[in-house]
Amino acid sequence: RHAFPAPRQPSAHAGLFDLLHMGAAASHARTKTLETAMGPILFRSFCPPSFVERLRPDSGLHSFARLPEREHHLLLDIAKSPDCALTLAYTPAGEIVGQVTIAPADEWWEDIEDLYEVAVEVSVNWRRATIARTLLSFALELDALEDMIFFAIGLSWHWNAKDLGISLHHYRALIAHLFGTQGFVEYPLTDPDVSKERTNVPLARIGKRIDKHVANQFLSRLLSPDSFGRF
């Protein structure tokens, strides 16, 4: 499975920022600072390519692309897409230690409106610095939050539980709790092949203003036997 979206044709919309902020006259980028036991961490939303280029990846940022350098290229591609929103956590020295990507769902979901996939990662070197929850919460501070459906597919083969000295089941519980703090709900596995690995987990947050028909359409697709087979 591609952890990050493949390059797409430019959206007919002005950009994902305008959709997520309902046309509000706000700055495209917000910033925040978190003091941790390992030092201060800076957060920035809607990171432009020029900003990503000036940063470098921490050595522990490699869950999705295997190598930090490759992941940096992926993050740069995401920043270049008007359809995606990239939020980064980084040190004052310019090392990327975490990221949250919000991207339109792929073609398999194309008839479902206002649907976005969320991917989050924190460097293994910074996992005990309480960054993930703050980063995800910061990325989801959106005016249109209740008008959107967000989902995340937790696949255990992306997880580096051994680096943390914990089991996959413990890691799964951490993932579910992390997203649960932002209103995501865990759903059951239905694909017979993927469900053999009980640590995989689908999570979703359905906005309060989403039409019931759209919500039911999404859940029917998410829980279909073909859903996880795509990944």
Please describe what each predicted stretch is.
Residues L16-V52, M148-F231:
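Terminal substrate-recognition subdomain of acyl/acetyltransferases
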Residues V52-L74:
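Conserved GNAT-fold acetyl-CoA-binding loop/helix
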Residues R66-L115, V120:
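A conserved beta-strand-loop-helix scaffold within acyl/acetyltransferase catalytic domains
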Residues P68-E71, T134-F138, L168-H177:
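Well-ordered, non-membrane alpha-helical segments in soluble/globular domains
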Residues A119-E121, L155-S156:
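Short, histidine-centered active-site or binding-site loop motifs used for metal coordination
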Residues V122, R128-A144:
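Conserved acetyl-CoA-binding loop-helix of GNAT-fold acetyltransferases
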